[in-house]
Each structure stands twice: as C-alpha cells, then as structure tokens.
Amino acid sequence: MHTPERNRLTVLDDVIITVDDGGTITAIDPAPADTSGLTVDHELGPDVVLLPGLNDTHLHAPQWQQLGTGLDLPLEDWLFQHTFPLEQRLTDPVIAAEVWPHMVATLLAHGTTAVAYYATVSVATTTMLAATCAELGQRAFVGR
C-alpha cells in the first residue's frame, strides 16, 4: 500500500517486490500465475500488510530515557525535575554512546525509518547521534 499522489491510497494485492543487494526496491510487478521459476527470499502471508517506513518529524533525543515519566507533573516541574537534568547528562559522550544506539535501534525496529531529531547543546554528542543514525541506517536530520 502506498500513496503515489496526494489524497490517493493505492493497495497493491499479490505483487512481487524486487529488492537489490543494497536494500533498494527496484521493481513492483503483479505476481505471475506461475511463480515456480522465481527465487523468493521472503513471502508474506495473505493477511500481512507491507507499509513504507514511518517518519517522526519532531523527536527530542535527550528525552528518550524519560519516556512516559512525570506525566502527572505540571510542565514546569516536569522540565526542571526530569528534562533539563537528563539533557545535561547527555552532553557526556560516554552516556550518549549508551543511549543513542539503543534509541535509534528501537525506533528502527518499530518502523521509524526517518527522524528529525533535536539533540543536545553539545556538538560532540549531537555529532555522535548523527553518526549512530548513519551507522544503523536511519535517515535523519539532527540539530541542536
């Protein structure tokens, strides 16, 4: 399923998707009635839907570790008790080296293939995040 143009959803039933060794889709064709001569690496079941990767257009990377915490607090308390101290800790390259790979790998595992990240005030750890995205294969805009 995809959206080839605005406001138009197309569902492709019973197709063959050809992917090259680099992971790039090179063709999407209707499946022939006889597939015996084809090399099939992976066949999806009849109830499986294949979607393109998801895009997260606004992710504060330093807040990854506090996901779901402090939800009962007013915004100012949440910022000063959770967010700002954590963002300060993530200017440390040792801590960032532990957090960034876990975060990027988790997002990729859940289908998020592109992200616009807000990183830290540290050039070093912001650069580390960009390098992690490149290494793990996630498309990203990384800013601070």
Task: Name each model feature, range by range.
Residues 1-37, 49:
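N-terminal metal-binding scaffold of metallo-dependent hydrolase/deaminase domains
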Residues 24, 40-42, 139:
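Conserved beta-strand segments of alpha/beta enzyme cores
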